[in-house]
Each structure stands twice: as structure tokens, then as C-alpha cells.
């Protein structure tokens, strides 16, 4: 009987120990599950951060691409503006050369007109002198008549030359007037071109500033991309570490569940044995 009591006490003690171990294993299992859930939450948060980092990286790359496209467009606009400035400078040079040629033709015509006027005045003076003189010498009269004829011829020639010069002068004046109109138009165009040149210069300065800012933004984007890439690598490393931790915790959970099953089986076996013992005692 004492042996049975001792056996029952031992079995009860073993049962209590088994229950304690089962409770401990259940608590450990709960803690392991909690750690696994926490780790899974960290993994989800890490994956979310990774997705956010990837989105930020894509956005930064798109902004960098847009900045490069805008910079290329500004460089093309700058080249077009430089071509327009060069063409305008060539047109100004041609207008200045045309004006110089017109001024030279005007000076030549003015000189020829002065010479013709001087010859006409001289002929008129000689004619008046010959008319006012009364010569008795026939030979001198003939000579004077010849001189008069020659003077008249010279006068007529001078008149003809004068008319020709006047006609040429009129043509030159017309050319000069057109040249002046072109010059005025050219001056207006020069003013417009200077204004356009000033605007182009301002645009060039703006483009230079924009290019400098674009370069600064490009460097900033590169730094951001580098930082984001480092963050992405760190996030991937944390995710990989978390995944390994989850696998390790899962193995620990599986092991604890196996131990819990074994302890439950032991507890059931002890309970069955106690029930059988109680039945045997009741039979006595």
C-alpha cells in the first residue's frame, strides 16, 4: 500500500511537473509566436519602406531625366539664338556696306555737279565779255565769233553734262533716299536687333544660371540616388536578416510545438495510468 501511495505521489508529482512544463512550453510558444508576428510586422514594414525607397528612386530618376531633357532643350534654344544673332550681325554689316557705297556715289555726283557749274559760269562770263566788246578788227571778230561758238558749244556741252549730271544726281538722290530709307529701316532693325540681342543675352544668362542650377540639381539627384541606393541595400540587408530570424523563430516554434505535443502525450499517459490505478484501488 505504501508503495502504491509513493507511486501515486510520484506520478502526481510527475503529472504536476508535466503540467508545469506544458504551461512553460505554451508560454514559450506564445512568446515565439509573438516574436514571429512582430518579426513579420517588421518585415512588412521593411518591405513597405523598400517599396517607398524604390518609388522615391524611380521618382528621382524621372526628375533627373526631365532635368536632362530640359537642359538639352535649353542648349538647342541657345544654339538657335546664337545662329540668329550671327545672321542679324551679317545683315547689319551688309546694310552698312550698302550705305557707304551710296554715300560715295553721292559725293562723286556732287563733285561732278560743282565742276559742271563752274564751267557753265566761265562760259557765261566769256559770252558776256564778247557781247559787250565792240571790235573793229574783222579777224578779231571772226576769232571772237569762233570763240563764241566754241564757248556756246562748251556751254551746250556743259548744259548737256549738267543735265546728265542732274539726271544722275536725281538717280543718286533717289538711290540716296532709298538708301536713307533702308538706313532708317536698318537703324530701326538695328534697334530691334539690339533689343533682341539684349533679350538673347538675358536668355543666355538665364540659360547659364539654369544650366548651373540643373547641374546642381543633377548632383543633388545623384546624391539622393546614392543615398536611396544605400538605404535600399540596408533595407534589403535588414529584410534578409529579418527573414532569417523568422525562419529561425519558426524552427524554434516548431520545436516547441513538438515538445508540447510530447508533453501532452506524456500527460495523457500519466493521466490514463492514474485513472487505471484509481480503478484498481476502487476495486479493492
Curated annotation (Swiss-Prot):
As one GO molecular function, the record gives:
protein homodimerization activity
Which residues does the annotated region (Disordered) include? 1-54
User: Which tissues is this protein detected in according to the database?
Assistant: Muscle (at protein level). Expressed in leg and chest protection muscle (at protein level). Expressed in claw muscle.
Q: Which residues form a coiled coil?
A: 1-273
Composition bias of kind Basic and acidic residues appears in 12-45
Q: Name one Pfam family in it.
A: Tropomyosin
Keywords, in A-Z order: Allergen, Coiled coil, Muscle protein, Repeat
Report the leader peptide range. none
Gene3D superfamilies, per the entry: 1.20.5.170, 1.20.5.340
Q: Which GO terms describe its biological process?
A: regulation of muscle contraction
The domain of life is Eukaryota
Q: What is known of its domains?
A: The molecule is in a coiled coil structure that is formed by 2 polypeptide chains. The sequence exhibits a prominent seven-residues periodicity.
Tell me which PANTHER family the record gives: TROPOMYOSIN
The record's subunit annotation is: Homodimer.
Q: What does this protein do?
A: Tropomyosin, in association with the troponin complex, plays a central role in the calcium dependent regulation of muscle contraction.
Family statement = Belongs to the tropomyosin family.
- Give the protein name, as stated in the record: Tropomyosin
